[in-house]
Structures are given as C-alpha cells and as structure tokens.
From Swiss-Prot:
Higher taxonomy: Bacteria, Pseudomonadati, Pseudomonadota, Alphaproteobacteria, Rickettsiales
Species this chain originates from: Wolbachia pipientis subsp. Culex pipiens (strain wPip)
Protein name as it appears in the record: Ribosomal RNA small subunit methyltransferase A
Similarity comment text for this entry: Belongs to the class I-like SAM-binding methyltransferase superfamily. rRNA adenine N(6)-methyltransferase family. RsmA subfamily.
GO CC list: cytosol
Function: Specifically dimethylates two adjacent adenosines (A1518 and A1519) in the loop of a conserved hairpin near the 3'-end of 16S rRNA in the 30S particle. May play a critical role in biogenesis of 30S subunits.
Enzyme Commission (EC) number: 2.1.1.182
Superkingdom, taxonomy of origin: Bacteria
Catalysed conversion reaction: adenosine(1518)/adenosine(1519) in 16S rRNA + 4 S-adenosyl-L-methionine = N(6)-dimethyladenosine(1518)/N(6)-dimethyladenosine(1519) in 16S rRNA + 4 S-adenosyl-L-homocysteine + 4 H(+)
PANTHER family in the record: DIMETHYLADENOSINE TRANSFERASE (PTHR11727), DIMETHYLADENOSINE TRANSFERASE-RELATED (PTHR11727:SF7)
Residues engaged in binding S-adenosyl-L-methionine: N15, I17, G42, E64, D90, N109
Amino acid sequence: MRKFLLKPKKSLGQNFILSNEIIKRIVALAGSLKDFNVIEIGPGYGALTREILAYNPKFLLSIEKDSSLVKHHEQLLNEHQGKYRIIEADALNVVEKELVECPVKVIANLPYNISVALFLKWLNNIKFFTNLTLMFQKEVAERITAEPNSKDYGSLSVLSQLLCDIKKEFDIEPKEFFPRPKVYSSVITVKPLPTPRFAVNLETLTKLTRAVFAQRRKMLRNSLQSITSDVSTTLENAKLSGDERPESLTIEQFCLLANNIIMR
C-alpha cells in the first residue's frame, strides 16, 4: 500500500484492510461466485477486489466515490476485461438493477459514514440480492443482529430481521486497518428471505419503529401518541396493554402493531 502513498479520506469513512487473511475470510463467506454478478462498495486500492476476482465471478462491479482511487484499478481492468468494471459514484445514489443483472451478491467493507443508510437502501430492494457479506462498525453490526430486550435492539434490528436471515460472523480489531479506527469492526452475512417473516407495510413499520424507539424508555401508550390519535384502539387491536416498552416487543408484535395503527 505504501507504493500508492495512501492518504485515506476521513470524510469518506475510508479504512483499508491490511490483512490478506481477513480479506480471504470475508470473500469465502460469500460462497461460490462463479455464476454470480458481484457488487463491491469502496474498493479502495483493490485488495478485496483482487480476492473477489480470484473466485472467478461472472462479473464484478466496484463502486468508488473517491476519484483518486479509481485510477489505481487500471491493471485489474486490463487483466479482467469484460468481467470487471469500476465506476466513480456515490453508492447511495446508484440504482443497482440498472447496472447488473440477477443473480447478485454483495461483498463490501462499507464506509463507516454511509453504512447504515446504504444497508437500509438495500433492504428496500432486498429481493434483488442473493446474499450480502458486509463489514460494519461492530456497534452497527450489533444493532442489526440484536434480539428483543437488549440495549442494541431497535428499528434497524426489526427491519433487518423481518426481511433476512442474518449472522454475525467475526470481529476485526482496529490494528488490522489503516488508518487505525477507534472501534472494532464486524463482518455479517445477510441472506434475504423469499418473503418477509410477517405480512406488513414496510413504510408504516419503519415510521412506527423509528418513532417508538426514539422514546425507548417510555411505555407504548405514551410513545405511540406521537404517531396516532387513537392509541387505545391501536393497542387493543394489536393485543398489547400499553405498559410494554419498545425493546420488549418481538418482530411479530411490531408487525401486528403496524397493521393496526392509524397514522396521524
């Protein structure tokens, strides 16, 4: 990496993986890539990119916002003509289905500053993907995988687990990155479900969970007042007393609540 005179940009949440062993572990978790199109976010100088290409995917699309890094992929582009493309773009604004066809897998060391927003974007179109192997800050990974009655359980947990099977695979120490972040990172695997675990309007569920978890220490009868004018009927139809706090509700209970709420 020194030969490239690495100057990671904090504004873009750049932290490059130093360990080839970790890179190999990440790509291996995605399984066979032979018949799949693959999307990579923030390829940086191409360490993860090279390992993905070694698995001989049908096609690899890398999305890089930093124009100064795109030029470092010329050799890979020449070596894998017709099977590799890198575009300069903000991943939050990319419409993946316009660039690659199914089946699609995602493998990415996500930039810290857009990881949650990007994952939520993908959840809204989750059936497009076969699986996703993603690195987050450990704190974010724990929010995604959290169970009810835990401090990390929230809107992100509910939405993620409603739509996917998710597993936290392993943690990575700060020393394995350049520059060294202040926090641990975690790799998770995401397998979209054929259908959501429970029938629900996702927009309503999102608004509901965000509203009540913004007041997570309040009982539901109080936190629901911000989004519905008929709290009593909503609770009765959802078979809830109102004494519950948001963190105690299961995903099924949240879906039942969302299906019975009349939004303001």
